[in-house]
Amino acid sequence: MMRRKSNLVTRTLNRKLPLLAALTVIVSAGFSISLPAQTTPYFRDKDFNTWLKTDNPVSLGITTMPNAGQTSLNAKTLSGDFHKAMESGRVNAWGFDSYGSKSLKPLNLWGRFNFSQERHQDRCWSDNIRPYNGNPYLTGSSVKGNYSYQLFDFSVRMSSKQLFDFMWIGIGLDYSLGDFSRLQDPRSRTQEIVYTIKPGVAFRFGKEKIGLNLSYGYSKEKIGSYVSKSKDSKEYLLYLQEGLGVYSILVSNAYDRRIESWKAGAALQYEHSFGSNSVLLGELSPFYRKDSVEDAYGATPGNYKEAGGRFFLAFRSGNWRSESFFSFKTGSAEKITQKSVTVTDPSSGVTSTRYETIFSIKSYTAEKLSAETGLSYVVKDTALPWGSKWNAGCKVWFNSDNDEYVYYSPVSSFARDNIVPYFYGGGTVLATKGHFLMIDGEFAYRVNLSDNYSISDELRDKVILDNVISPDREIMTSDFLKVSATFRYVFPLPATSSGRRLSGFTSLSASMCFVPGLNGSGRNLIGVSVGILH
């Protein structure tokens, strides 16, 4: 059995946790977990501060946030067989979540700190934490197993208040550490570190505002695999994917892979005010990403590059909200062939191995286009600090994907188009003596518009095609209905020793997915949370 290397996450936390804790106290944000299905901010800030929908951290300075926060304990369970081949069959999770905003004399601050602990069941084919992020270079076993996933996630935003009566400056920082470990042979361990920094500025010229922010991000995913109990490790194989069913096989014995990713971007914002309660805001944000894949001893099977952009437009007039966005990205992977070279240092006699590239060629391309437009009506009552009086809206989302493995002739390709109409609404149904009951719901139906699928005759071995690509195609092109609802109850707590009154809350969220074309298929999510509003 191979002794594990020291835990990157633990060592990094020991160095960074004091700083994270200090910043968290400053912005009134404690411990937390991110549970997407039930993260319902008690202030609907984005409905009334349109700049919060942009990527610019000066959004905190343009409109001052309330001195408030939320701390909660959350749990969720996700189950059902309507999921992609490299996703987990079942996920049980719990954690803490705390975030808050604070207005100081020169600055407006916002911060969030999350911790989550997840148990994944029946997962196979990929030990990558996010196997569907575009990069085709994936690693995994065909043997289903259970995984443990820990995530520490920290975010902070700082913005000046208005300077010289015409400008704001701000900065944002995101930092996370993840540990994704398989609990059975072949035992893989994936460790990830991600950080992003976003400086921003905005200027006011009468009824116009112009903003600009830059973004730089770095991440590193390190995957290791070994066999601990079997005497014959050759019975465990790793499948190293290259895109659309192409793969190679490696015995799972002391395997290592590192994927480093760099992402740079910018965002330009423009706002025009038509009056005290009518605003038009647009944002254009291009980006570029590069992934470098490296195996043991510096061998490189390939790399992945991606570029794209997003245009966002929001209009607010009174209680009406209209939002639209259009985004696109194109990615390509290179297949690299190398040879090993053994070098001996003449003075020390030490022998080392390095890899030299013989040739490289484009092997895989991916194109993605998404668009959405929607209209909503939101009624806010200042007597209801924990939500809107009521809201209703609809939107339509369109998505088009086209993946090709161009190393083969003819090429392998998979293209699909989907459209999803949404209808949602909710509000406060009870508000009396500090007690509030809020209900929100959503109804969505995905319709597949087209499905073009072609596999090259050059693909001889079809293990990944039959077990990953074809099942994923069925999931990605199936029509389905999704219904979700959230119930949230807020109640007063006894006054503190300083006389300050806080509120507690509890919430229940549920989401159900029904697939008419696949008998018995579905995906269900149930989540609960209990916490304090402060």
Language-model features: locations:
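Extracellular/periplasm-exposed beta-strand and loop segments of Gram-negative cell-envelope proteins
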Residues: 83-89, 121-129, 138-148, 184-190, ...
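Transmembrane beta-strands of outer-membrane beta-barrel pores
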Residues: 75-81, 115-119, 162, 175-179, ...
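N-terminal, post-signal peptide beta-strand-biased segments of exported outer-membrane/organellar beta-barrel
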Residues: 34-123, 135
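Residue-level signature of outer-membrane beta-barrel architecture
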Residues: 102-104, 160-162, 201-205, 270-274, ...
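Surface-exposed extracellular loop regions of Gram-negative outer-membrane beta-barrel proteins
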Residues: 159-183, 194-198, 279-296, 389-399
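Outer-membrane beta-barrel "beta-signal"
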Residues: 522-534
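Outer-membrane beta-barrel transmembrane strands
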Residues: 87-94, 146-163, 168, 190-191, ...
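Outer-envelope beta-barrel architecture signal
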Residues: 67-71, 105-111, 165-169, 206-210, ...
